[in-house]
Amino acid sequence: MRHYEIVFMVHPDQSEQVPGMIERYTGAITTSGGTIHRLEDWGRRQLAYPIDKLHKAHYVLMNVEAEQAVIDELETNFRFNDAVIRNMIMRTKHAVTEVSPMAKAKEERFTRRDDERREEATEAASEE
């Protein structure tokens, strides 16, 4: 089996369908004997340039190990699913399991925001 990195972008109006799509695609990979090494839902993000007059899209990243037939099936599903506006399937040399820079940045942003709120709360409590 080969390793692949898969990124697909979903129309922002169809964001509520993303969990079902992820479940369907991961199910197809695992039932055929493949494994999912990394799955990240990056959420709705700004596009670098408009695609079909859209400025935002819902991003999903997957690193998988699967047979070529399953990847062909996924590619066909992406092509005929109107909610998927772009996709990229890239073969990699090895399994990637560490957290992506996108997810790290999002995590750091949330922890920094939580730390600032805690500091403000302790300052407000000490002033009283």
From Swiss-Prot:
SUPFAM superfamilies reported in the protein's UniProt record: Ribosomal protein S6
Superkingdom classification of source: Bacteria
InterPro entries given in the database record: Ribosomal_bS6, Ribosomal_bS6_sf, Ribosomal_S6_plastid/chlpt, Transl_elong_EF1B/ribsomal_bS6
Basic and acidic residues: compositionally biased ranges: 104-121
Gene Ontology biological process terms from the UniProt entry: translation
Free-text function comment from the UniProt entry: Binds together with bS18 to 16S ribosomal RNA.
PANTHER family: MITOCHONDRIAL 28S RIBOSOMAL PROTEIN S6, SMALL RIBOSOMAL SUBUNIT PROTEIN BS6M
Protein name as it appears in the record: Small ribosomal subunit protein bS6
Phylogenetic classification of the source organism: Bacteria, Pseudomonadati, Pseudomonadota, Gammaproteobacteria, Aeromonadales
Gene name per UniProt: rpsF
